[in-house]
């Protein structure tokens, strides 16, 4: 797959993080699949990435010299050879099936063989504080557009167009939603609990944000106040600005949460204020790593470039870390849902973290 520019990577990864953030006390496990055809340059490329909460833990790339499911987090390395053999077999089977699906969907849309096309899948589960399924996901996209998705009732589908309706009919005939529901309510949650226990020092930690407010003059009459939150984990955080105690939500510029490249996250929120009225504005920060919410004001004597330097350094690290490893995964969230097709064959045992995963063809 072609390497994406750093700015694009950041935008795509931000979109993915918006997906992985869940309710307080809950956790998630999601897999992102991407298959890209490349006429004249060999077989389509297939990439699979797994996440627990905001942490990537497995990776598979069909273009590797010896394609294998690979660990991407220290706590997953304790899994035995059977685990890696099983997950590798699932990914290899999916790679072949998604290649067939690309050919079939090209026919559905009456497209020529000359162009490159992409199928993306995101599926997984959110687990609530009680250890049960909170929400399940099964979404597909084709060429960057919604294709088909499992509804929240986990028993019906939403097809984006007439081509996707063909897939929907096949899946309904195969009772695919029932199998998915069993996986989401059972195997997915069970593996998520296991991963959370094995990686609890990393996955269940709560690093509080380092916070600061900076001041940036716009003119003689206005200035921007920017509230920074750096170095926090997990990714879920709330930044709000108030003027004399009243929320300024509509007037706040808020960026998506961004990875810092060191397994922590960054975010900022900004407001434009009249010069001389800066002290009427307060930034409020809520995060599970804080014993109580923070309230900050701009302190003229403490103006510092440290937060800006921290952001720049973090983004530089991020560009190096994720360009090769995350692009394929996060693109799936950006497109939201999409497409493959309908027949299925068992690829591995139900003990697989990816599920009693099936190979789907259009």
UniProtKB/Swiss-Prot annotation:
Domain Ig-like C1-type: 209-295
Residues covered by region (Alpha-3): 207-298
Keywords tagged on the record: Disulfide bond, Glycoprotein, Immunity, Membrane, MHC I, Phosphoprotein, Signal, Transmembrane, Transmembrane helix
Example of a GO cellular component annotation carried by this entry: MHC class I protein complex
Sequence segments annotated as region (Alpha-1): 25-114
Bilayer topology: Single-pass type I membrane protein
Connecting peptide: annotated span: 299-308
Stretch list, region Alpha-2: 115-206
Localisation: Membrane
SMART domains reported for this sequence: IGc1 (SM00407)
Protein name from the UniProt record: Patr class I histocompatibility antigen, A-5 alpha chain
Lineage, highest ranks first: Eukaryota, Metazoa, Chordata, Craniata, Vertebrata
